[in-house]
């Protein structure tokens, strides 16, 4: 598959600024995804988290992983179908994510049955694991 640029990402995700946390999908095939989030100093959360030492909030890294997870289903969902976050298991944060980092988002579909799904995810910066989590989601008409 060709990489999906932001225009394509916005066709799949219902999110809009300031909550789009996937900038590009490098690959999405066989239930596995590799996506990118370019973390810039202009992110709206940095002035408050933290003013003297900006760090991307862990919950937003998890949200980025959840958004990337939706591309595990690329081409399988009916138009107007949305994935809703249903749970997060085993979230661990191992490295700070700061302005200038390129956050690589990896997701692998474990299952999708009766509108419920689960992905195993990790986020990396410079080849180091920044976060890991299992994402649970429900798929329904938006």
UniProtKB/Swiss-Prot annotation:
Q: What is its EC number?
A: 4.2.1.59
The UniProt entry annotates the active site at 49
Q: Which CDD domains match?
A: FabZ
Q: Which Pfam families match?
A: FabA
Q: Name one GO molecular function term.
A: (3R)-hydroxyacyl-[acyl-carrier-protein] dehydratase activity
The yes or no answer to whether the keyword tRNA processing is present is: no
- Family matches, as InterPro entries: FabA_FabZ, FabZ, HotDog_dom_sf
**GO cellular component, as recorded:** cytoplasm; membrane
Question: Which catalysed reactions does the entry list for this protein?
Answer: a (3R)-hydroxyacyl-[ACP] = a (2E)-enoyl-[ACP] + H2O
GO-annotated biological processes: fatty acid biosynthetic process; lipid A biosynthetic process
* Keywords recorded for this protein, A-Z: Cytoplasm, Lipid A biosynthesis, Lipid biosynthesis, Lipid metabolism, Lyase
Q: Where are the transmembrane segments?
A: none
From the Swiss-Prot or TrEMBL record, state where the protein is found: Cytoplasm
What HAMAP family has UniProt attached to this entry? FabZ
Cross-referenced NCBIfam families: fabZ, PRK00006.1
Q: Which family does it belong to?
A: Belongs to the thioester dehydratase family. FabZ subfamily.
Function recorded in the entry: Involved in unsaturated fatty acids biosynthesis. Catalyzes the dehydration of short chain beta-hydroxyacyl-ACPs and long chain saturated and unsaturated beta-hydroxyacyl-ACPs.
Q: What is this protein called?
A: 3-hydroxyacyl-[acyl-carrier-protein] dehydratase FabZ
To which species is this protein native? Deinococcus geothermalis (strain DSM 11300 / CIP 105573 / AG-3a)
């Amino acid at each position: 598959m060709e990489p999906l640029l932001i225009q394509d990402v916005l066709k799949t995700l219902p999110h809009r600024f300031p909550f789009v946390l996937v900038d590009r999908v490098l690959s999405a095939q066989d239930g596995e995804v590799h996506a990118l989030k370019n973390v810039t100093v202009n992110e709206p959360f940095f002035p408050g988290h933290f003013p003297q030492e900006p760090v991307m909030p862990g919950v937003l890294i998890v949200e980025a992983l959840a958004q990337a997870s939706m591309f595990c289903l690329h081409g399988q969902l009916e138009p107007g179908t949305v994935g809703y976050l249903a749970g997060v298991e085993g979230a661990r944060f191992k490295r700070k994510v700061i302005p200038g980092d390129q956050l690589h988002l990896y997701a692998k579909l474990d299952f999708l049955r009766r509108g419920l799904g689960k992905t195993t995810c990790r986020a990396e910066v410079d080849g180091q694991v920044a976060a890991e989590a299992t994402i649970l989601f429900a798929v329904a008409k938006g």
